[in-house]
Amino acid sequence: MIKDEFKPVKDIIKSVEGICDEKIIVITGNKRVKESGDCKILYFPWHDDYSTPLNAGLRLCESDWVLRMDSDEEIDEINLKRVQKAVTLRDDVWAYEVCQRGYLPQKRVEFGVKLVPEHKGYTNAVDDRCIRLFRNDPRVFFEFNTHETLYNSLERARLRYVKSNIVIHHWGKLNMKDKASYYYELAKDRARRHPEDMQSYYYLGVSAEFIGKIEESYQAFLAGYKKYRNEYYRVPMEHLKRKRRSTNGRIN
């Protein structure tokens, strides 16, 4: 899915054409773009919701499996081979979790940042588990306006998903400065509309921390921990508690 520029996806198209039977591009901008290649193109108006255009794109798919990638991502040869192996490995699996490795500037400090094997000069990253490889099945679809997910639909349909060793390289965090406030507003809206979803407080906390709203981030993780009492919220809550102290009492 891209906004209004076809160029960023050309490298993705080139990298996957050896294993993909079809390529579908969803364009959410308000103008036509210069297209190239043998891709199916869907123009879909943007309305502050990532799931809806992605689901519209899924309806164009005819292949048995879907590999979903964004314009600020890439997949290397090693992981393409892992994708090829995964789709032929098990008949009882409907989807695979991958590692979305989001690279960051070396001095960036926030929850989840760690050292990773060097890739194109970067060793600082956040690893997020998400489902990007899944069967083309009408029971499997994206939900939520931001940090769109397939987990809920898979679980409702009782379809099995498993972890994989597939890594997708993500460069979007390097250029988040202009978009971070917008993503924060989307995360607030998701938490307001879906307070019952376990991940809503988490993504609000992550988005708030990224733009320096430390107190709001802490309160989001704290609210999630009080509600669910699990490690998913306890660990980032403790991280933000320490970060609050390091601000010498300054509250954002």
Predicted regions and their residues:
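Start-of-helix register in tetratricopeptide repeats
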Residues: Q199, Y232-H239
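Short, well-formed alpha-helical segments that are part of the catalytic scaffolds
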Residues: M1-I19
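Residue-level signature for tetratricopeptide repeat
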Residues: S207, L240-K243, T247
